[in-house]
């Protein structure tokens, strides 16, 4: 079943009006007709099962059949801080991170980042990454569309992470799987967790020291060296499994929204 997102202001009682590119996609690409069914999420934790009523000018009119609290969000907010990779790797990282439950994605320039983006290029990249995040959220039936932040410096990213409950830094020189297991096991539902991933070439040692001074916890992901596009997704997968296994009902927690 097709899944779309609508701003809460588009929800009016038993009716939802979609606008923008989604209308063209529904009407001209999917060729959805009155009576066909779709899921709509408001980005704030509510899902709506709807029936297409028809199209009016530049809007798709949907009738709400039932609504329920989204059950697809993790019980903790996972924020992926991704060192800028080369080429189009960031697009793939954004897509998969959203599928794995990332709440927000923060790209940053590290000392070993090869890619250098000026303000104009960074803005265009972010728009592209945000569009990919929206598509991935629709495909994976997320209750929110994770935000992709503006590109930051490493220092700005560390300052941003100061408000989080836990900050993890997978590092190839870190040892001790038992220590990593102990750190992961202590993460509680409702906590916010940052994951810092270096670019190709990893982190500079000075960045690791800076992260530790700020309270970040270096962890290991095993004996193998992972690519930058693999390390973050591996960490997200581990955390997703840990949180899902805790079997804590998401409805018992305050619903996170990306408006905060």
Where are the regions a protein language model picked out?
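C-terminal functional extensions of proteins
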Residues: 241-249
